[in-house]
Every structure is written in structure tokens, then in C-alpha cells.
Amino acid sequence: MTLRRAVFLAENGIVVQGDAASAGDGRIPRLLPAAGPGLRLLRDAGFAFHVIGNRPCVARGECDEDELRTVARRFERLLEDEGVALTGCSFCPHDPHGVRRDYAVDCLCRLPRPGLLQRAAREHGLDLARSWLIGDSLDEIEAGVRAGCRTVLLDDGRESEWRLSELRLPHHVAEGLGEAALLILEDEHVLDWRRRAADSGRLGVGRG
């Protein structure tokens, strides 16, 4: 089987802040501006997509895994509306300090550990060495680096601690998902500077 390259999308980095915060409130999250066009550029370059995130609400007794499956379907529907298919969504339900004993464990899938990405790669035939992670926290960046991916940090103000180390240094920093897509395509030698200039204007990217 030929392994595919993918872009792992940290859930908080692709939707309007707060939209996907609750598993049980029934809201459909909204994509950030320029996310749809950026993802379509990556889709056209042959990338698969997989959403990841920590969901400790299960361990804390605030939701269950059925509700996480509902969240996953919301993300799938949201991206389908933009013409982008997901291989799936992977959420870590654990929290070492949770109240549900079966989920209050020190697991290998809670970001910044790489277990979510590694499991998705096994289940969906993804090549981690040729894949990228886009996230807006250094814990997400660290998970990508540990898994062997290249990474883009979205500088949207969510990261406040800035505890840097070799594992927490992104390959690129972008102002939004549209710019992140262009940076990835440049690194993959899919995009030259002429197309970058045209697509930057279409995606609302300030530089380029």
C-alpha cells in the first residue's frame, strides 16, 4: 500500500475560537477566514486531512465518547461543505486528573505526545515523514515534531506560555490557515513565487 501524505489539523486552529469547545451543545463550528480556500489548495496538491485534539471532558465526566463521535461528524460535515474530505478525527479523551478512573490515565495520545498522529497514520495509511501538522499551540507543534512531521504554528494569540525547546520549534509560523497552506506548498515545491503572489491576494494573506 502506498502511504499518503497528510495535513493534521489541530481542531482549535481551524475553527472560530470557542465554536468547538463543547461536545454536547449541538453547535456546528465555523471555519476561520481563508481556511476553506487554503485547504482546497492542499487538497489539490494531493494531501489528505485528519483533525486531532485533546478532549479531556470525557475523563472529567462532562461528556462521553458518543458525544466525541458527534463532534467528529460535525467536523466532517463542515469540511465537506468546503469540498474537503477528512480521513477522520482523533481525540484524546484522557486526563490524569480526571474523575472517571478508566480515563484518568497517563496515556500516549494526549498532546503533546504523538500517539494520536501515530494511530491515525496506522489506521489510514499516512506517511508521517511526508506529512504536516498545523496548530496554534506549542503542545500541538511538539506532537507533530515527535511524530516526525513538519509543522506550522498559527500565531493567533492562543499560545501564551511560549515554553520553547527543540521539540517545540515550528518549521514555519503563519498568521492564518491560508498562509500556512501557501508555506507548505512552497516547501513541497508545488508553488512558485508567481502563483504565491496570486494566491496570497485571493486568500487575504498580507505578505507575498
Give the residues covered by each predicted segment:
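Substrate-recognition element of Asp-dependent hydrolases with the DxDx(T/V) motif
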Residues: 35, 39-78, 82-98, 144
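Conserved Lys-Pro-Asp/Glu-containing loop-to-beta segment of HAD-superfamily phosphomonoesterases
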Residues: 108-138
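Short acidic-hydrophobic, aromatic-tinged amphipathic segments that line or gate anion-handling sites
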Residues: 171-180
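Short, basic, low-complexity termini and linkers enriched in Ser/Thr/Gly/Pro
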Residues: 202-208
